[in-house]
Amino acid sequence: MDLFKLFSGKPSSKEVAKDRLKLILIHDRSSIAPELLEVMKSDILKVISKYVIIDDDEVEVRLTKTEEVDASSPALIASIPIKKMKQR
């Protein structure tokens, strides 16, 4: 057992590959093209940037699915680290 990996908090390459495969499957099933997702991400960041200073390098926007009782539907998840609020 590698104790460094246990406490580093970084996902293994196996976990990264698994997550990427899940994203590919979700994109395929939701019929939202990756290009459209990038355009949506860009538009969202433009609007948010009017009000706050964000960390562009750490922004993560992904498509996932919701777990509903009768069916699952696509959901857009955004993690946008805010550095500070802009003065208005």
Swiss-Prot record:
SUPFAM superfamilies for this protein: Cell division protein MinE topological specificity domain (SSF55229)
Keywords tagged on the record: Cell cycle, Cell division
Keyword rRNA processing: no
GO BP terms: cell division; regulation of division septum assembly
InterPro entries given in the database record: MinE (IPR005527), MinE_sf (IPR036707)
Pfam families linked to this entry: MinE (PF03776)
Coiled coil: none
Function text: Prevents the cell division inhibition by proteins MinC and MinD at internal division sites while permitting inhibition at polar sites. This ensures cell division at the proper site by restricting the formation of a division septum at the midpoint of the long axis of the cell.
Family designation: Belongs to the MinE family.
Entry protein name: Cell division topological specificity factor
Species in which this protein is naturally found: Clostridium novyi (strain NT)
Source taxonomy: Bacteria, Bacillati, Bacillota, Clostridia, Eubacteriales
